[in-house]
Amino acid sequence: MKRKLTGLFGAPVSDRENSMTAGPRGPLLMQDIYFLEQMAHFDREVIPERRMHAKGSGAFGTFTVTNDITKYTCASIFAEVGKQTEMFARFSTVAGERGAGDAERDIRGFALKFYTDEGNWDLVGNNTPVFFFRDPKLFPSLNHVVKRNPKTNMKDPQANWDFWTLLPEALHQITILMTDRGIPKGFRNMHGFGSHTYSMYNDKGERFWVKFHHRTQQGIENYSAEEAEQVMAKDRDSSQRDLFNNIEQGNFPKWKMYIQVMTEEQARNHKDNPFDLTKVWYKDEYPLIEVGEFELNRNPENYFQDVEQAAFAPTNIVPGLDFSPDKMLQGRLFSYGDTQRYRLGVNHWQIPVNQPKGVGMENICPFSRDGHMRILDNNQGASTHYYPNSNGAFEDQPQYKKPALDIQGQAYEYDFREDDDNYFEQPGKLFRLLSSEEQQILFNNTANEMSPVTDALKHRHIRHCYKADPAYGQGVAEAMGIDINEVDLDVAD
């Protein structure tokens, strides 16, 4: 049975195709209210795109606990082996706009939202375990250099590489990005990482530092630079198509979740800053501990409703999980929620994909009121709108207080380079883990990506690579057609 057309407020529509005019060939009349309503809505259809991670794909699924980690955390989501929790995942490219090609060389976003029975837990990460820098003050500049030049409105490799090579700590991330892992074949075929150091605490109040790893069960598959060009020439939505079609066909992708755990005592004695996002924790020192598995098994019915309006923020945590002194994480605690309030409004938590389904909307009792689009909870009705109050309308839940975190030091803008200038050890170790064929691919990809930039930037990058491993610097120089003897390798970084 066909549905009968109405306007937004229920009035029947008599003619969807023909506007009201003064005579059959006369001008349009402004009293054609359906035309006005449709055009006014159309003019406002597009909401601001994300400043980063603009183009994404998403799916719903289920997380299942497969190993007991209750000695580390009292979070209910991990309470017992076999416990299941509904979830939503969003994958994305990072630098590109909404129309970006899925097979571009770029980091991939890997954001997870778990609808736990203690509230939503958002684990916001990428497909790499590290990042370009370790201070969030650099975030706006990173965005600017990977986006478009303000004069030409074109991508600007010179600005991009100038910024990256002025940050020697970026070499670790750059090295990963310039391997074939910089272009995953699809979202199903890549690992994910929480990247930041988070913390867990148990029912005894003991705190542990943790890193999250999500290992694909479909196997790692990547495109070469040449393959990626061919794919994008035919299909700019290749990763989204792959994810959507496989789920529709019942071929549900799965990932295993693991954690690395570091005690507070180990952190105090760790060689490097354990909260430095440009470095990893070595697995031989902090082995992977299995936590669970998640499966994505349902596509959204409407992309805009569930994927475009999905709002992730690392501030969405639950009892038993907490933050760390990681400065990048601390910066994201503000920025993520703030961008969602700008994109979607202060009441974006009422959008279905963002609702705390595991708790139930009827049990949500925030103290916030009003704001654009406050529609689902009667705006708390006539209940008391201040606290404390004499009628006992609300009460805290002190049993969920977090254990104390020992923080010491004087407030100051510390130069992190004076604290830790060990930029090149881990990129060097990563380079030596690559096969000779993979190393050559790294050289060639780097030379290709840097081909538009000046020799001064090439020399700077070669110097960083050389400091990580002489063979790394030599290989990049040869791929660029540069005599390494012409590069000043002794400049301090």
UniProtKB/Swiss-Prot annotation:
Specify which residues bind heme according to the UniProt entry for this protein.
Y336
Identify the stretch(es) annotated as Disordered: 1-24
GO-annotated molecular function:
catalase activity; heme binding; metal ion binding
One annotated Gene Ontology cellular component of this protein: cytoplasm
Q: Which GO terms describe its biological process?
A: hydrogen peroxide catabolic process; response to hydrogen peroxide
Give the catalysed reaction(s), semicolon-separated: 2 H2O2 = O2 + 2 H2O
Positions annotated as active site in the UniProt record: H53, N126
Q: Report whether Iron shows up as a keyword of the record.
A: yes
What is its cofactor? heme
State which Enzyme Commission number(s) the record gives: 1.11.1.6
InterPro entries in the record, alphabetically? Catalase, Catalase_3, Catalase_AS, Catalase_clade1/3, Catalase_core, Catalase_haem_BS, Catalase_immune_responsive, Catalase_sf
Q: What does this protein do?
A: Decomposes hydrogen peroxide into water and oxygen; serves to protect cells from the toxic effects of hydrogen peroxide.
Family of this protein: Belongs to the catalase family.
Q: What is this protein called?
A: Catalase A
Organism encoding this protein? Staphylococcus xylosus
